[in-house]
C-alpha cells in the first residue's frame, strides 16, 4: 500500500462550509438510496474479500453459441437451464444473465420472462442456433450450484471488480481513516458545518457491491483546503473526493470521477462541487489494458496531486474582473451563448447569494452553477455546468 500524507493541516472538528456555491451531484446519493444492507460494506478489506472470493469461484470461457442447449428444468416448468460443452451439470442463468442472453439473440427480455419456460427455451435455442457472431463468452460460478453470472459477445473485455477495489486500497488502505482517504463525514444542516468524524455504519458507508457491480466513494475531508474567502471574510473550504464503479458482468462501464467539494450530507449528496473530472472505460477488447495504463494511474495521480493548481485557479478567477457595469455583465454572458433570460437569472443569482452584482469570473461561475441547480432537466443542467467549468478554466 502507498501511504499518503497531506500538506494541509488536519481538521480537529467540524468546519464551516458554504454549499450555495458549486454544483450538487446526486450520483452517490442514488447509490446510497438503492443499496440494501447486504450490499453495504464497512471497510475496503471487507468489500475486497467479498468480490475477490466470488471471482475465485468463477471462470470465463468462449464457446460456440450453437453448442449451448436451453432446457426447461424438470422439477420447475418456470425455470430454464443451460447445458454447455464440458459441463456435466446444467447451469442456471441469473436474472441479469438471462436478460443478456435474450439481448444477444435479439429477443425482448421482458416478453421472454412472461412466456412459459418450455416456450422460452425453444425461442432462445432458435436464436442461439442462428446467432450471427457464432461465439459467446460466459462467466460461470460454482456457489453450491452452477450459475451463469454473465454472457457477452466474444470481444468483451472483463475488468474484475476486485481489481478496481485493489487499486483503490493501494492509496486508501481500509478506507476507514488509516490513510487520509476515508468514508466521508456528514454535513450538519443546523450549523452548516461538515463533520469529518462520523462512525462508519451501514447507514453512513459509501462502499457498495452487488452481484452485478461495485461502487465506492472516498474523500480526504480531514484536510480541508482554503481557496479564497467568502463575502463575510471566512475561508472558503473544500476537500478532495473521488468515486469509482465497475461491473465485471457487463451491467455498466468502469469509471472514476474526481473532484473538489465542500460537503457531503447524510443522504450522500455532494455539495459545492468544483473541478469534476471523469474517466470511463467500456468493456471492449482492450479494456483491461486501458484500466492498467489509464484509469489506475489517473486515480493514483489524483490522490498524490497537490491542490495548488486548483487553489491558484480559484484565486485567478476571483481576481479577474470582467464586468463593472450592467451592460458589461450582459455583454459578457451573451457573448458566451446565454440567452437574455438566462443572463438575467445568472445576475439575479449572484445578487441573491453575494449581495452584489457579478464582477469577477468566479462570480459569474457561481451564478451559472446556481442557475444549473434550479434545472430539473438533466441535459440543460449539464450544459450550464459545462459552460461554468469552461469559464473557470479560462481564468487560469
Language model: regions and residue ranges:
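Intrinsically disordered/low-complexity terminal segments and short unstructured peptides
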Residues: 1-2, 279
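Feature for intrinsically disordered/low-complexity regulatory segments and propeptides
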Residues: 2-167, 171, 197, 360
Amino acid at each position: 500500500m502507498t501511504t499518503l500524507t497531506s500538506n494541509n493541516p488536519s481538521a480537529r472538528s467540524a468546519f464551516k462550509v458554504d454549499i450555495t456555491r458549486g454544483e450538487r451531484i446526486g450520483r452517490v446519493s442514488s447509490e446510497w438510496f438503492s443499496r440494501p444492507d447486504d450490499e453495504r460494506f464497512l471497510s475496503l478489506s471487507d468489500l475486497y474479500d467479498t468480490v475477490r472470493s466470488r471471482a475465485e469461484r468463477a471462470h470465463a470461457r468462449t464457446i460456440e453459441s450453437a453448442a449451448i442447449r436451453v432446457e426447461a428444468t424438470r422439477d420447475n416448468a418456470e425455470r430454464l437451464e443451460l447445458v454447455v460443452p464440458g459441463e456435466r451439470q446444467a447451469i442456471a442463468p441469473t436474472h441479469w444473465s438471462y436478460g443478456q442472453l435474450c439481448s444477444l439473440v435479439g429477443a425482448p427480455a421482458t416478453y421472454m420472462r412472461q412466456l412459459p419456460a418450455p416456450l422460452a427455451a425453444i425461442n432462445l435455442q432458435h436464436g442461439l442456433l442462428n446467432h450471427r457472431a457464432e461465439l459467446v463468452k460466459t462467466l460461470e460460478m460454482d456457489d453450491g450450484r452452477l450459475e451463469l453470472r454473465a454472457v457477452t459477445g466474444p470481444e468483451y473485455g472483463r475488468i474484475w471488480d476486485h481489481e478496481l477495489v485493489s487499486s483503490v486500497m493501494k492509496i486508501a488502505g481500509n478506507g476507514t481513516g488509516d490513510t487520509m482517504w476515508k468514508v466521508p463525514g456528514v454535513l450538519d444542516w443546523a450549523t452548516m458545518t461538515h463533520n469529518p468524524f462520523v462512525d462508519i455504519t451501514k447507514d453512513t458507508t459509501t462502499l457498495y457491491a452487488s452481484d452485478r457491480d461495485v461502487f465506492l466513494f472516498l474523500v480526504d475531508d480531514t484536510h480541508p483546503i482554503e481557496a479564497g474567502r467568502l463575502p463575510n471574510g471566512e475561508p472558503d473550504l473544500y476537500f478532495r473526493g473521488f468515486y469509482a464503479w465497475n461491473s465485471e458482468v457487463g451491467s455498466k462501464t468502469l469509471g472514476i470521477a474526481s473532484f473538489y467539494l465542500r460537503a457531503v450530507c447524510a443522504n450522500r449528496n455532494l455539495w459545492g462541487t468544483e473541478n469534476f473530472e471523469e474517466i470511463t472505460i467500456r468493456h471492449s477488447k482492450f479494456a483491461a489494458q486501458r484500466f492498467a495504463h489509464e484509469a489506475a494511474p489517473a486515480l493514483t495521480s489524483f490522490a498524490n496531486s497537490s491542490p495548488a493548481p486548483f487553489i491558484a485557479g480559484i484565486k485567478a478567477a476571483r481576481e479577474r474582473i470582467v464586468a463593472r457595469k450592467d451592460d458589461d455583465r450582459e455583454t459578457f454572458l451573451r457573448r458566451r451563448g446565454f440567452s437574455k433570460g438566462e443572463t438575467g437569472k445568472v445576475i439575479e443569482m449572484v445578487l441573491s447569494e453575494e449581495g452584489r452584482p457579478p464582477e469577477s469570473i468566479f462570480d459569474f461561475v457561481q451564478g451559472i452553477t446556481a442557475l444549473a441547480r434550479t434545472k430539473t432537466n438533466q441535459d440543460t443542467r449539464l450544459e450550464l455546468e459545462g459552460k461554468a467549468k469552461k469559464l473557470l478554466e479560462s481564468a487560469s
